[in-house]
Amino acid sequence: MKTAYHFLIVVLITACITSCATKDEPIVITPEHFHNAIDKVTEVIIHDIFSPPVASRIYAYPNIAAYEILAVNDTEFNSLAGQLAGLKSIPTPSKETSINFELAALVAHMEMSKRLIFSEQEIETYRDSLYTTWKERNEDVFVQSRDYGLEVAGHIAQWMDGDNYKQTRTMPKFSVYADEPSRWQPTPPAYMDGIEPHWNKIRPFTLTSSNQFKPVPPPPFSLEEDSDFYKELKEVYDISKQITKDGDTSEEIAIAQFWDCNPYVSVTRGHLMFATKKITPGGHWIGITKIASKKAGFDVINTLHAYAKTSIAMNDAFISCWDEKYRSNLIRPETLINNHIDDSWKPILQTPPFPEYVSGHSVVSGAASETLTSIFGDDFSFDDDTEIAYGLPVRSFTSFKAAAEEAAVSRMYGGIHYRAAVAVGLDQGQKLGKFVVSALEMKNETMVATN
């Protein structure tokens, strides 16, 4: 009996020591936690087949929520309240709390991500695995941090609900008028309706209006062989024929495929049609942001600064781009080439389901390259492995601007854009990106990462 009593005492003491150790362990949040959380968002965006404009919104709000929590608690950074349209200061926690603000930021990020996608269970499963670990390490800190993160997410979600996204879900579909030869027409193989024709009604973060960076109009539509428009049309056809002839040795085809980023690619087999899974253009640049942040050795707050600034610029870039797309309503090369030059011709890339002018890749890449350059510098070289998961090799770049230029011209190599849409779109995006950089005061002093 005495031996059993002593054994019980030892067990209780051991359990107490173990419990105390577990409950008081620090919860360490690293940049990798945020990289992984954003990778999970990208995975769900691909799974749920969100359009490029909608995907840009999905990236932006979680990054803003996470950034805000850390910015208001770091003297080096500034809150975005009052800088982004309609955003008010996030709730202030009690001074008596034991909040881990990096943990709270990650909670807010995951909560906002969950609210923005269809497959909520994917985020919930990922989140719950982290919650279990954190609770075992320090339940008190975890609970307080979680509750604050959820409170901030609720604040950001309320602000988000005023951006007109919900209203655009019930607006009419884009109307196609086949009797106007210059207007966009649905393209094979899926002949989908035009995607997000009302995206210019979404509230921008920094722009005064969706047409603030309205580009010059495209060349006047004409099928006269000596017209500027026809020359650009013929250029698309001639380039495609040449690089197709070169085949696997064509650098242009490699570039086109690397920057395809079309979540709407459809494959037809017999009477069946199914979609392949691809990253969006914004998702590709979010991947580049991750690569650069890791190479620069950024801590959590600097990592979130890079993600937030870049996703804000891309969100506004898509609004600006889509404003022009459905104003000019320009027909795609594929339609005209099939009707007037070569009825058997197919572009190297599948034509995405929205009007041609301007190139979305060009605008968004231009904007993202400007924000990343403002953070990491003009000559920040990097190896872009973003597309490895989708069966494509690594491509190396000497700067973000060089990557943006390649992303832009890839659309002409792919046979889905005319030269004007590429050149004008890149310029539009660069101007917009520079505006975002100048408009946002996110850091109290300029600190450019070294390569």
Which role does the model predict for each range below?
Residues V11-T14, A449:
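N-terminal non-cleavable signal-anchor helices
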Residues A21-N451:
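Acidic/polar surface patches and capping/hinge elements
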Residues A15-S19:
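C-terminal motif of bacterial Sec signal peptides marking the signal peptidase cleavage site
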